Amino acid sequence: MRSSERGCAPVSMCGALISRSEPYILSMTLVMMTSLAMARERERGTLESLLATPVRPLEVMIGKLAPYVGVGVVQVTLFLVMARLLFDVPMAGGWDALVVGVMLFIVGSLALGFFLSTLAQTQMQAMQMSIFYILPSMLLSGFLFPFRGMPDWAQALGSLIPVTHFLRIVRGALLKGVGLADAWPSVMALAAFVVVVTALAIVRYRTTLD
């Protein structure tokens, strides 16, 4: 049975909607989940116990975020399987670009959540900061409105948001079969975001420990 017979017609519209939804849902869950988890540890005082250990900030960050990388991979896999089986979304290819984009986006989202947790003193503050990031991502990334139809200043701000570039990778890979070579600008933008946010998170976490 085609997806148009299941309440999502036409198929191309359904595929476009689902491909736009994945980056936003993934960002929302990973950023908020990480920031809340780390803020909860701060409230409980478990982070202070790391002061007595020789573990470096980068090692702490990797240890804390590694399990959530697996959560993100499982989430993306389930999303793609459901999109194909339930809505018959076409999978045009471009798997190399999709895999690289997914991993960069997951790591970047988790690093951002970690960074926000170093700024927050409570779980409530962590949640508010996460929402403050998520809402502009929804409005400026092309999720709700066509990116090229937005004003120049909105496009400039949207280009700084990782969801924008991940959305292009997912949409291009699933609907058009765009490979890694053609998706290189968006991949490099995500990689730059990962490097910058990870560095900020490490510096901020080191300052917190000091």
Where are these regions (language model features)?
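Transmembrane helix-boundary elements of multi-pass transport/secretion proteins
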Residues: 1-78, 82-98, 119, 125-128, ...
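Generic alpha-helical secondary structure signal
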Residues: 17, 76, 135, 165-169
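Short amphipathic alpha-helical coupling elements at transmembrane boundaries
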Residues: 48-52, 121, 155, 159, ...
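Alpha-helical transmembrane segments of compact multi-pass small-molecule transporters, enriched
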Residues: 74, 78, 104, 132, ...
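Transmembrane helix segments
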Residues: 120-164
